[in-house]
Amino acid sequence: MVKPTRINIGYFLLYLFIQYSFGIDDTHTWTSIGFEKNLPHSLSLEFEQELRIKDRLSTFSQTISEVSLSYKVIDGLNISIPYRYAVFDDKIKQRLSLGASYKYKFNPISLKYRTKLQRSFEKEKTHEYLIRNKLIIEYKLSKKIKPFFSGELFHQFNTNNNQLDEYRVSFGMAVDLPRKSSIKIFYIFKNEDLTKTNPDKINVFGLSYTFKL
């Protein structure tokens, strides 16, 4: 028998999906594979390779290679330096970030807050700076299944009042698999380029696979 709590969570996520699906300009998919490796001195290394499709799932958008070095300060508190190399049809874009995150658990719920300052590099263009703040709520349904919900804000850095440039709302589920691997299935609604007259509203459906070395 399915527990009422699980049913309520399912209805809530379905409601959010329906609410954010109206007035959508495009639909994308993000699929990725990655690995994690613990290193000495409380360090860890992560790598992810991702493919993104746009134009109602019909056109190549970009492929992303990202490597990240993280340091565990104390339990729950981490500092990270991610580097991203993204290849588009007509350009190459690089990004370097400095981030910090803190996770607090009170079973079966955990809260995670992440802040990140990122700088994007693109040939013959001015460097772009953004500040990102993200809150993630995770619920432990079982030892292997964890639904989650998150919200994220993107602010332009060093502009008038650090203007809001984009926001994202996401929900999904992380599932632990055998042999130190896991998958994550997720949906993202993102409203980007908010400084423009007509911001872009985009649906994203994603799947990621991660394994630990």
Located regions from the model:
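Residues on the lipid-exposed face of transmembrane beta-strands in outer-membrane beta-barrel proteins
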Residues: 33-37, 67-71, 98-102, 133-139, ...
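Repeated loop/turn-to-beta-strand initiation elements of outer-membrane beta-barrel proteins
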Residues: 41-47, 75-81, 107-111, 143-147, ...
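Residues that define the transmembrane beta-barrel architecture of outer-membrane proteins
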Residues: 27-29, 61-63, 92-96, 127-131, ...
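Transmembrane beta-strands of outer-membrane beta-barrel pores
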Residues: 49-55, 83-89, 104-106, 117-121, ...
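Start-of-domain marker
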Residues: 23-85
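Detector for outer-membrane/organellar transmembrane beta-barrel domains
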Residues: 101-104, 108-155
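N-terminal signal peptide c-region/cleavage motif recognized by signal peptidases
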Residues: 18-20
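Predominantly the C-terminal beta-signal and adjacent terminal strand-loop region
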Residues: 149, 160-213
